[in-house]
């Protein structure tokens, strides 16, 4: 499944009531660990001269989710007859297939393989959750499906009924490495005409953990709107209109121009998960973005959201930005593979 995101100038309007959250570092109690794995970065995107800044920006985006997700998910522990393959899109080649065999995944941990490659057309980045194939005891295979989450029902190698949770082993994220004017330093203002790497990383990570890419998301989509109760409340009591890049077959983003309030300071901002981003600007996670994650099953503890250290410097930048319109396509592989 492909999801296209358009990057263009947006003018966010004041929306809803501000939710002010104290900006502290550290993880939420019982937090999920998101382990960024660069071992499949076959093009060396994260090991060139800008590699340290790229990693710092990606890991700062990762820290946001480690700071608010308080879920608990079971470990994946292969051994003996219990064997499995983690599948997905290789971040360095784009090939779809096995990424790792008999990968051990610790409890409360997601693994995100990150890399870079030349993406076709005007694509900036791609990301999404991984799939799997496996065999073994009933308990082992069930755990590949649900990692102990009761809201994911399955049987005979197919998922059954309405899904209210999501718990993948992890996923992949890839950034264009040949013709994008990236701004890598997440601690400084975004240069005019450049695309903010932190913003792209934040957006892709949300997709990697199920936003627009999971069965529990799909089960809440109706007539071009998202019907999740917490998103509805965050959106002033209305279902959230969605954007489709393929004429209504799939919906993976809030509709263009959707606004909410930043978790970091309660200021109004265009959501991180609408399809529009402007060169020269930075986006932060908003309340509506977070409620989308809550509705697909993630337990959240929104008391502390770490953002780049200079978010205050950037607070007036989100409405600015100059440069050509740019589109990028996400390439998530949903966790629906059978044994």
Label each residue range with its predicted role.
Residues 307-325:
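A short, hydrophobic C-terminal helix/tail in secreted or cell-surface proteins
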Residues 10-13, 17, 321-325:
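Alpha-helical hydrophobic membrane-insertion segments
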Residues 21, 207, 320-321:
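Active-site micro-motifs of SAM-dependent methyltransferase domains
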Residues 14-23, 27:
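Bacterial N-terminal signal peptides
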Residues 2-15, 309:
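Bacterial N-terminal signal peptides that target proteins for export
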Residues 7-10, 28, 332, 337:
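N-terminal cationic leader/targeting segments used for protein routing and processing
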Residues 322-339:
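C-terminal membrane-anchoring or membrane-association module
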Residues 29-202, 207-304:
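Extracellular zinc-dependent metalloprotease catalytic-domain scaffold
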């Amino acid at each position: 499944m492909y999801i296209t995101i358009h990057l263009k100038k947006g003018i966010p309007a004041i929306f809803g009531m501000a939710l002010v959250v104290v900006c502290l570092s550290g993880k939420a109690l019982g937090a999920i660990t998101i382990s960024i794995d660069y071992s499949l970065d076959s093009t060396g995107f994260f090991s060139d001269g800008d590699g340290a800044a790229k990693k710092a920006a990606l890991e700062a985006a990762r820290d946001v989710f480690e700071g608010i997700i308080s879920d608990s998910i079971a470990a994946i522990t292969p051994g003996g007859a219990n064997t499995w393959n983690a599948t997905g899109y290789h971040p360095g080649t784009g090939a779809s297939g096995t990424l790792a065999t008999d990968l051990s995944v610790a409890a409360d941990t997601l693994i995100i393989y990150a890399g870079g490659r030349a993406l076709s057309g005007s694509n900036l980045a791609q990301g999404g959750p991984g799939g799997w194939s496996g065999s073994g005891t009933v308990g082992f295979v069930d755990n590949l499906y649900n990692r102990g989450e009761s809201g994911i029902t399955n049987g005979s190698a197919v998922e059954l009924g309405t899904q209210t949770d999501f718990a993948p082993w992890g996923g992949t994220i890839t950034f264009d490495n040949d013709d994008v004017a990236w701004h890598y330093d997440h601690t400084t203002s975004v240069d005019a005409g450049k695309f903010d790497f932190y913003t792209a990383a934040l957006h892709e990570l949300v997709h990697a953990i199920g936003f627009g890419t999971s069965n529990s998301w799909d089960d809440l989509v109706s007539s071009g709107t998202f019907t999740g109760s917490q998103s509805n409340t965050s959106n002033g009591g209305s279902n959230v209109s969605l954007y489709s890049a393929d004429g209504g077959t799939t919906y993976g983003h809030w509709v263009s121009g959707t606004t909410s309030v930043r978790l970091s300071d309660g200021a109004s901002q265009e959501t991180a998960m609408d399809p529009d981003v402007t060169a020269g600007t930075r986006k932060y996670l908003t309340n509506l973005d977070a409620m989308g994650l809550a509705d697909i099953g993630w337990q959240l503890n929104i008391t502390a959201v770490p953002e780049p250290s200079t978010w205050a410097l950037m607070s007036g930048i989100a409405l600015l930005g100059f440069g050509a319109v740019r589109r990028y396509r996400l390439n998530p592989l949903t966790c629906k593979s059978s044994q």
